[in-house]
Amino acid sequence: MTSVRYVAIGDSFSEGVGDDLPDGRQRGWADLVAQGWANARGSGIQYANLAIRGKLIWPIVEQQLEPALALKPTHLSFNGGGNDMLRPRADIERIADAFTRVLRRCDDEGVTVILLSGANPSPQLPMGRVIQRRGDELSRAVLARAEGRDDIVRALNWPDRVLSSPPFWSPDRLHMNARGHHRVAARVLEALGLPVAGEWWSLPEATVAGPRGWSYYREHVGPWLRRRLTGTSSGDGREAKYAEWTSVAPSGPSAR
C-alpha cells in the first residue's frame, strides 16, 4: 500500500475555525478528512495543515504553498478567496489566477491537488447578494482553469444549498460549525473514492442560537470592520497548527 502524505493550505475554512473541541482546539474538515482517510485505509497517514485564518488568497499562495511542497506531500488541498470576496473590491480573475499557480506548482512536483470551493454563507450575511454573485463568478473561473483535468480531485461545496442553511454555521454566520465541517469532510472523502460515515453528511442539529439584530453586528460585524480599518487580520501572529507532519492512526468508524 502506497503511503499518503496529505497537506492542507488555505484560510479559516481549511484551518477549521468554527469546529471547536471541548479542550479549546479547533478541528475542521481537513482534520476529519485525515482521520477518515486513515480509517478507510486501515493504516496511518501523514498529515499537515498550514492554513491560517484571515488570509487573502495570494498571501496563502505566497506564504504556504512552497513550505507545503517542501514537505513532499502526495496530496495537497487548496481553497481560498473567501476573504477576498468580502472586500469592497474583488478581482475575480486575479483570485482565480492563484488556483492556476497552485495547479502548476503541484504539477511540477507530482502532487495530486484536492480542489475545494468554499461553503456559501451568503444567504445569511449582510451584502449577501454581492457575495453570492462573486462566489458564482469565482466558481466558474476556477472550474474553467481546471477543465479537462481528470487528475484533480474536486470537492465542490459552493453549490450545496443544504450546506448554506443556518444549521451548518457558527453564530458569526461566516464560519461553519462542526456540522458544516463534517459535511465538507464527507464530500472530500467521497471525491477521493473513500467510504464516508453516513452521519457525517448531516450530524444532529446543534441547539446553540446566535445573536440577532444589533447584537449580531456588535459581536461579529463590528470587530471585522475594525480589523479592516486598522489593516489587521484575525490571523496576525498565528502559526499553522500542523506545520510539520503529524501521524494520524486509524480509529473507530466515526472521528467525532
Task: Place the predicted regions along the sequence by residue.
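Aromatic/hydrophobic pocket-lining residues that form the small-molecule binding cavity
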Residues: 61, 95, 99, 135-139
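Serine-esterase "nucleophile elbow" of acetyl-processing enzymes
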Residues: 1-53, 65-72
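Conserved catalytic region of serine esterases and O-acyltransferases that act on ester linkages
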Residues: 150, 172-175, 179-256
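Oxyanion-hole/transition-state-stabilizing segment in secreted/luminal serine hydrolases
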Residues: 15-19, 43, 57-94, 120-121
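Short glycine-enriched, charge-decorated loop/helix-capping segments at active-site entrances
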Residues: 19-24, 90-93, 128-132, 170-171
